[in-house]
Amino acid sequence: MFTGIISHVGKIESITQIKDWEISISIIDYDSSSIASSFHSLILGASVACSGICLTLKKIENNFFFFDVSHETANKTNFLSWKVGYLINIERSLKVGDEIGGHFVYGHVDTTAIVKSIDEIKGSYKIRFLMNGNFRKFIAQKGSVTIDGVSLTVNKTKQNIFCVNIIPFTWSHTCFRSYKKGSIVNIEIDVLARYLEKLQKISLDN
């Protein structure tokens, strides 16, 4: 489980496909100049959110962190758009006693969305996303949504489009700074919205 508060940015160093995919990631500090020492305490088998995708750490070698990515994960997320040099958001899993600064995030990507526009407004950024119509019912104004692993508040919604505001700190400390029009992002729906929809279906069936 995660909170959607990004601690570091990772850079894809290699992508290898045999049956599934293997990726290696270097964890970089916010100044992009050095490996983040805080990640050297990770143990093999640990869960790490990589742009909102919960992946299992399988190997650490030469300051690179290796993960496997299955076909199921690749087909349901934006993974197939990742390339060497691609920046991703990184969050270690939540521990008992940690501060919950965002909302509960599970690392289970529901769908993807496309960046429609990015507007800078006095140092902050307004980003509009186009998402799959089947999931629009889960996006509510002032509700929570996870975009590439980041816990955010929905500012406005209109049909299949919703927008969020990104403050300067979040922009500079996440992979959002590399977004362009047409970028594909991972979306995780707030778990409360999913359960409410399930309860509503059960109620209607009865």
Model-predicted segments: where are they?
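Conserved loop->alpha-helix
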Residues: 1-206
